[in-house]
Amino acid sequence: MKARRLALWMGAALALHAATAAGDPVSHSAYERETIDAALEQTGGAIDPSPDGKQIESIEIITLEVIEERDPVPGFFNVFHATTLKSVIRGELLFDEGEKYDARLVQESARNLRKRRQLSLVLLVPLRGSSPDKVRMLVITKDVWSLRLNTNVQIYEGKLLTLLLQPAEENMFGTHKMLGGLFILEPDTYSFGGQYMDRRVAGSRLQAVVSANLIVNRETGSPEGSFGTLFYGQPQYAVETKWSWKAMVVWYDEIFRSYVGTDLRRYDSPATPGDDRIPYVYDAARWFSAYSVTRSFGRELKHDVSTGVEIDRRRFRLRDAQSFAPAAVRDFTRQELPVTDTRVSPFLQLRSYTSHYHRVHDFETLGLEEDFRLGHEAVVRVYPASSEVASTRDMLGTHAALGYTLPFGSGIARAVAASTIEKSTRAATDATLQLGTRVVTPRVGFGRFVYDGLLISHYENYLNDQLTVGGDGRLRGYAPKQFIGKDVLASNLEFRTRPVQVWSVQVGGAVFYDTADAFDGFSDVRMKHGTGIGLRSVFPQAERIVFRADYGVPVTDKGFTFPGSLFIAFGQAFGMPTLPAPSLETDYRE
């Protein structure tokens, strides 16, 4: 179930101080330094330590093959891959020959390229020019395998929870257009479909995504739902882009099933004498569409004004309700089943943020450059709804969020806070408070500490939204999604080692201590604890995302609870906190 939602949001995502100031020194990983040294030898160039203000006399692009000489795989396999065209790389650069070198435009160009799924390594290096007042720009990129089987897998205690396979040509003819299929295997269903993505429609800045998928019951072989995404628009592709817009639709129509590990989650009503064992199985449908336009002001200090309209339709119904005691069904519906609701809302949004970034290594990936925005980010949105215009409720929605990020040596510190209130009648008001924090220390010996804290409180829960925590994320050692509630509190500490390069593969380790709980009201909090070790690896030939294997054991008053559990998946157990979106989709992400 989560994989379908993940694939859906991936479709929408596909659809959808100054440590980086001029003159600041740039550090590189051993893998990146090795790449730069080879490129300098190839071009016969030397790095220019002070390129600012000099005229760019040439732009030289080196596109590395997926399989290089330093890799243990024969280079013959490169014939099955379409290397990115140099014209595609050049089209993403925000500077040109004859212009003055501007560090901010160079860095923004690098960030734009790193967003591309088809590229794992991106390096922009200024070289000494033919005279002291000129500079050559060296652009180095490395493709990931284009004809590929994208995979996401979740394994718990040796049992397959989710398998996602996405056979795709992600770089058709070297143009970064993607055509692919999708297959998701879950305990009770499998899903299949297709998707197409064009980041530069007809050579323009317009982007388009189309994705549609069918859900089939594994036991009966009958279709039981669908999900997909449609997106068309022009994103804010550069700091100085003034206008952006989008039109998008996201939908799913499914039989929702909630699991604890590999077993169906079940509900027991306190109002009945026996164990009701009502399974968390219900019809769930959601259709969301958004149409908006944004005007952006400023360069270093940005202010975006957005307006548009959103339509959000939610439908939920318990299956086989007649098979259970009426009192238990009423309790389940009131306490656990999401509420059917329709909202049609025009909105006005103001967003303020800086265009300063901190360039780092070994945060969310290994051995590759990463960029995190520094300074403040603030969002305020107002969105009314009326029952006279197809909405279920008369309400006034407000969303306010604030985040701040500081460099911490080679680390970073970030805090975010957000409040969403949909004010209606007392019984129909929905309100959420979310707090998050992340501290990544500078390197300590052979690694760095990462602390992450999270609080989500649905203190008014008209929509009956439910959250889970477990071994698939912030509470390793327990069953995936083992605990459920409207509120979540989590505190996670990891020590992540510096990666070791094995050929070109980046390999690192982790030691962690987790404490978390999902609960209904703070009087119900019972924090659970877990600890363990993990393995992280990144294959630059395939992906920037880490592959992780975490072995954890619960920690109780009596000590460690063995045998514990092993969980295998892609991506870190918890991501860098960001401002929560006020709706299903508010920005286009590659």
Put a short name on every predicted segment.
Residues 191-197, 220-227, 246, 256-266, ...:
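Outer-membrane beta-barrel translocator domains and adjoining extracellular loop/strand segments
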Residues 53-55, 135, 145-149, 161, ...:
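Outer-envelope beta-barrel architecture signal
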Residues 62, 154-156, 168-170, 182-186, ...:
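Outer-membrane beta-barrel pore domains and translocons
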Residues 194-318, 333:
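Transmembrane beta-barrel wall of Gram-negative outer-membrane proteins
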Residues 93, 377-590:
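C-terminal transmembrane beta-barrel domains of outer membrane proteins
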Residues 163-172, 190-208, 228-236, 289-295, ...:
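Feature captures outer-membrane beta-barrel proteins of Gram-negative bacteria and organelles
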Residues 23-160, 165-169, 176, 180-198, ...:
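Periplasmic polypeptide-binding modules associated with outer-membrane biogenesis and secretion
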